[in-house]
């Protein structure tokens, strides 16, 4: 009969085995762990920057409105002050961008996409102060712009800054921290962590290099930025529209029709944006003085509108709950929609530092509400709320314009806390995206990036020709 023999490993052999194990752990590549730790740092910094940006915009807007209160007794003076306050703030933003960091103009999201493809530079030491303070000027002046563009570009540049400061090497670290910062910026702008993650995976899918490390880093960065946002702003939904009733199954076809409407309007809106960019470029011709004065005129116009018709200016977050509640007549909704289309095109296409997410969400809400009011009149037997179409339409224009339906749906759900409307939102967003793809045309950010790269290539070619000409002489 055989018996088990006890282990005869000597203490010396055990010590040797432990040393080998420790040596293996020490020699293992620490880059993935370092990236994840840096992602937490990036997310924290981006969240703090987004909070500071949000608070700064709110403070400037309050100061601007406070200045108007002191001139309330003199109507001509009131209009003059309303124009000048917004014009000066806007000119400050335009000047910073044009003088110190042209890549900080506009949304900034195409710049991050270009950087992820190694086609655009990331000069964080210039972009961070210019985008932050320039964005404070334009958004604080009441221009029709969103804060997500600045926070996404600021976030991406913070990711690159952390990479440079801590001297992390390798393309994986550079790419991952850039994407992490961008995702954290969107999450902090809207208090929407899942939308921030989906934004990178869906909207930046051609540029984002999906690996286990990169997606974990994005998760960590988004978590930290959202925590920072909620520490200072609490855990409430960003837009309070109340709890709306669910949409019965036999009414879902109406949301598909709404999606078709947005699928037609989305590509048209994109063409208008690009066309307005060309028109405004012909106006200033690249001259910094003309460009700043043009920006001041646009900003001043928004300042006047903010006093005369507040629903037509600003990012649109204050408009969304009012429109969803049905507090506007059909005629007023049409006026607001047309006015905001014009002001959105003027502000965004002029190159002002600011995003277009929020203005498009507001446009989608207004158009969705108008459609809902028509449906309520035509089909009273369904007992529907017009507000449900406002929520469904809020993300539909986003889906049709930038071809990111999932991001639009989840963003609206997280912002409004109306998860019971997820099915009509999916139907509306999918219908809008499919028809927009069928009608052709690039997604908005891709089209803007293509223009930027073409301009960059033309400038490089011109410089090379000038250099060769000087050498020949």
From Swiss-Prot:
GO terms for cellular component: plasma membrane. One of its GO terms (molecular function) is voltage-gated chloride channel activity. It is a multi-pass membrane protein. The keyword Kinase does not apply. Residues 1-32, 117-123, 167-176, 202-214, 282-287, 439-473 are cytoplasmic. InterPro entries: Cl-channel_ClcA, Cl-channel_core, ClC. Residues 109-116, 177-189, 193-201, 387-401, 402-404, 405-416, 417-421 dip into the membrane without crossing it. It catalyses: 2 chloride(in) + H(+)(out) = 2 chloride(out) + H(+)(in). The record marks 148 as: Mediates proton transfer from the outer aqueous phase to the interior of the protein. A motif (Selectivity filter part_3) lies at residues 355-359. The keyword Kinase does not apply. Its main location: membrane. A motif (Selectivity filter part_2) lies at residues 146-150. Keywords: Antiport, Cell inner membrane, Cell membrane, Chloride, Ion transport, Membrane, Transmembrane, Transmembrane helix, Transport. The chain crosses the membrane at residues 33-69, 77-100, 124-141, 148-166, 215-232, 253-281, 288-309, 330-349, 355-376, 422-438. A motif (Selectivity filter part_1) lies at residues 106-110. Homodimer. NCBIfam families: PRK05277.1. Belongs to the chloride channel (TC 2.A.49) family. ClcA subfamily. This is H(+)/Cl(-) exchange transporter ClcA. It comes from Shigella boydii serotype 18 (strain CDC 3083-94 / BS512).
């Amino acid at each position: 009969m055989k018996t088990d023999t006890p282990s005869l490993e000597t203490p010396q052999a055990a010590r040797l085995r432990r040393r080998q194990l420790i040596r293996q752990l020490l020699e293992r590549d620490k880059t993935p762990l370092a990236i994840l730790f840096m992602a937490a740092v990036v997310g924290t910094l981006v969240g703090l920057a987004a909070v500071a940006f949000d608070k700064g915009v709110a403070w400037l807007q309050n100061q601007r409105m406070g200045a108007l209160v002191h001139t309330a007794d003199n109507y001509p003076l009131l209009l003059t002050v309303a124009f000048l306050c917004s014009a000066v703030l806007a000119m400050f933003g335009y000047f910073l961008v044009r003088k110190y960091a042209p890549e900080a103009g506009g949304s900034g999201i195409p710049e991050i996409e270009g950087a992820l493809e190694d086609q655009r530079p990331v000069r964080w030491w210039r972009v961070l102060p210019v985008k932050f303070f320039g964005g404070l000027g334009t958004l604080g002046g009441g221009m029709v712009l969103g804060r997500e563009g600045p926070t996404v570009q600021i976030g991406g540049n913070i990711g690159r800054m952390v990479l440079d400061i801590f001297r992390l090497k390798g393309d994986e670290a550079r790419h991952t921290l850039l994407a992490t910062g961008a995702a954290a910026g969107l999450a902090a702008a809207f208090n929407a962590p899942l939308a921030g993650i989906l934004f990178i995976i869906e909207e930046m899918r051609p540029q984002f290099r999906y690996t286990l490390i990169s997606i974990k880093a994005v998760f960590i960065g988004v978590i930290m930025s959202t925590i920072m946002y909620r520490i200072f702003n609490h855990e409430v939904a960003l837009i309070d529209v109340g709890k709306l009733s669910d949409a019965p199954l036999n009414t879902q076809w109406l949301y598909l029709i709404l999606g078709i409407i947005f699928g037609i309007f989305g590509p048209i809106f994109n063409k208008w944006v690009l066309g307005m960019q060309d028109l405004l470029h012909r106006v200033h011709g690249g001259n910094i003085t003309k460009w700043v004065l043009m920006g001041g005129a646009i900003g001043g116009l928004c300042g006047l509108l903010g006093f005369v018709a507040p629903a037509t200016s600003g990012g649109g977050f204050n408009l969304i709950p009012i429109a969803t509640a049905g507090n506007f007549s059909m005629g007023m909704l049409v006026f607001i929609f047309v006015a905001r289309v014009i002001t959105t095109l003027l502000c965004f296409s002029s190159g002002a530092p600011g995003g277009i997410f929020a203005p498009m969400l507001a446009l989608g809400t207004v158009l969705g509400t108008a459609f809902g009011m028509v449906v309520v009149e035509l089909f009273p037997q369904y007992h529907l709320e017009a507000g449900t179409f406002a929520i469904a339409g809020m993300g539909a224009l986003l889906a049709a314009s930038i071809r990111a339906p999932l991001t639009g749906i989840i963003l609206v759900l997280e912002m409004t806390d109306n998860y019971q409307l997820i099915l009509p939102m999916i139907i509306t967003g999918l219908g809008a995206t499919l028809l927009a793809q069928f009608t052709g045309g690039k997604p908005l950010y891709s089209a803007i990036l293509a223009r930027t790269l073409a301009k960059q290539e033309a400038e490089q070619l011109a410089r090379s020709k000038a250099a060769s000409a000087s050498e020949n002489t």
